[in-house]
Amino acid sequence: MRPAAISIAWAAIALTAGACASHATLPSVRFRNQPAVNVVDDRRDVPSPPGGREPLIGEYYYEGYFRRRISRALELRPAQRALGVNALDEVPDSTWFENRIGVRDLSPDEVRAGATRVGSPEGFAPFTIRSSKAAGRAVGFVATDTRGEKFLLKFDVRGFPEIETAAEIISGRLLWAFGYHVPETHIVYLRREDLVIAPDATTKDELGRKRRLTERDVRRALRMVEIEPDGRIRVMASRMLDGKPLGGHPGEGTRPGDPNDRLPHERRRELRGAYPVFAWIDHLDLKIQNSLDMWVTDPANPDCHYVMHYFLDFGKTLGWMGMHSGDLRRGYAYTFDPGDVLESFVSAGLEARPWEARRAPGLRGVGIFDAHTFDPAGWIPAAPVYAPLLLADRFDRFWGAKIVMRFTRAQIGAAVDAARLTDPRAAAYLVDTLVARQRATDATGS
């Protein structure tokens, strides 16, 4: 045998012997055969309300459109997979998310009820107005019914009957079934005499200064809302959330002072994976102000407090934004989109765009919401301000798409039924369109 071959043989023998001798010192296997985590322990006591500053709306859009887009590009960060998943790449239950339709079959009645806990305030008039908010054409009153339950009353903008109130109800039910924490909402019909102003009711002027709410303020506000010929007013009543409001959750980082909030929000699967369901319902108005963190008391232990995370304000879904603004690009381009402007300039406006074929169906209660131009993978919100969606990858989108595909026609129909649309054709159109958009989501997997 050649010397080289002899050396190799002896080396192999030595390695084998060494491996056998050290077998007893090898570390244990890293992965154990045990159940995947299904519930996150994020309800540990937070003795006092956490801090955190919610940015002004102008500041927020400046950050999203300009500063963070530039700084994020300069950071040259590699793509990072989402956190907050278990060994099966699924999202456990937490203060952010609760698995519902993704893990069990919900009955149509469950979807129709959504987040209902105390029930509709209809039949519990008069409503005592405690405060009002009026921003532009958006009108809202915080009022209590005769049970003492407090609701935010929101209305349809004059000239757009049933669209915004129906969208709030339908999308809220679908998002609740998907797994998100949302407020309890109901459609209520009332009359002007059902609204009573409390002696200490307040409002704010254009400069944000608080003052007493007057009858004149209420009359002026109601002139901007849709009122039926018989004097009835259609209202979306959203029950005020329990606890102390902390403002919306930031799109990046964590909330200061909340020890349970450990994962950067931009890397949470339940936030990044919302892309398919938001595209499905055309949830364009994504911003920090349309989420709300609440410092709550544990129902089973009054000495324990923690933060619950909610999404809210879905009235601009289901094509309302495109309908109200007359901007057919909504969902296909940002409201301010230099790239889209440049493309139009270079092509001299001659290139056909998919959104040019969009039309409202001409049905009461339905906005510009269709399936034939819907691109699930190309849909974008109104502004590039919500970081989790901007960073969503194919794994996040696949996770969300799987849950969207769990909805049956009967469950979707139950969500639409809760909106109490007066035209049966409108309800049928919305169900058909949501099913068609769902199938498009299935075809792309995102």
Q: Predicted segment positions?
A:
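Low-complexity, highly charged intrinsically disordered N-terminal segments
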Residues: 64, 68-113
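Conserved ATP-binding subdomain of kinase catalytic cores across diverse folds
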Residues: 114-251
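Sec/Tat-exported extracytoplasmic proteins
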Residues: 145-147, 178-179, 278, 438-445
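Conserved kinase catalytic-core segment
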Residues: 163-168, 249-340, 344-348
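Bacterial N-terminal signal peptides that target proteins for export
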Residues: 1-9
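C-terminal catalytic region of ATP-dependent kinase domains
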Residues: 27-59, 63-67, 298-446
